[in-house]
């Protein structure tokens, strides 16, 4: 086994998809970390949850997750062919938490404020970045969701992982004030 995905039942956040990724030194820089990140989000999709890694992230964790979030969001925004997608739509499709989605869109410089609303605007730079991701994709280890046999754990309490609309507005308002 080259890497491991750990998720404990005792994590402090019900939206934490993963607590720790370990890739042994001999297998680092070979795509196993990103593979494990993708695997954790595929499990979140099966469970119909949004999630995020346990925070704070290490420097390497920030780089790995930031790269993964950027790649997937650009794939959805550019590759889906849909003209109108909201933050809620992106969270539903990717299983990313709203704050991770918004933060990544900001880092990619894709959020624009216009007439009292935020719009997702695809720049030429983002299209170029998407082309680079597509070129690298041929050599990456990918998760095939059809090969995952997983039965989600059902706890006694019910949570609504999609309760994000008010959080999205709050996050966007915070950025506007800064």
Question: Predicted segment positions?
Answer:
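Extended, composition-driven regions rather than compact fold-specific motifs
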Residues: 1-30, 35-178
């Amino acid at each position: 086994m080259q890497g491991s995905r750990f998720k404990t039942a005792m994590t402090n956040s019900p939206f934490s998809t993963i607590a720790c990724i370990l890739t042994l030194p001999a297998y680092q820089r070979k795509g196993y970390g990103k593979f494990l990140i993708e695997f954790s989000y595929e499990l979140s999709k099966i469970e119909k949850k949004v999630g995020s890694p346990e925070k704070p992230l290490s420097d390497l964790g920030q780089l790995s997750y930031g790269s993964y979030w950027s790649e997937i969001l650009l794939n959805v925004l550019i590759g889906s062919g849909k003209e109108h997608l909201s933050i809620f739509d992106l969270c539903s499709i990717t299983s990313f938490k709203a704050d991770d989605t918004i933060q990544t869109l900001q880092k990619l410089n894709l959020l624009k404020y216009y007439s009292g609303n935020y719009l997702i605007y695809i720049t030429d730079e983002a299209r170029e970045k998407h082309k680079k991701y597509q070129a690298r994709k041929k050599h990456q280890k990918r998760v095939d969701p059809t090969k995952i046999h997983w039965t989600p754990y059902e706890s006694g309490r019910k949570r609504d992982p999609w309760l994000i609309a008010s959080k999205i507005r709050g996050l966007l308002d915070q950025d506007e004030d800064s």
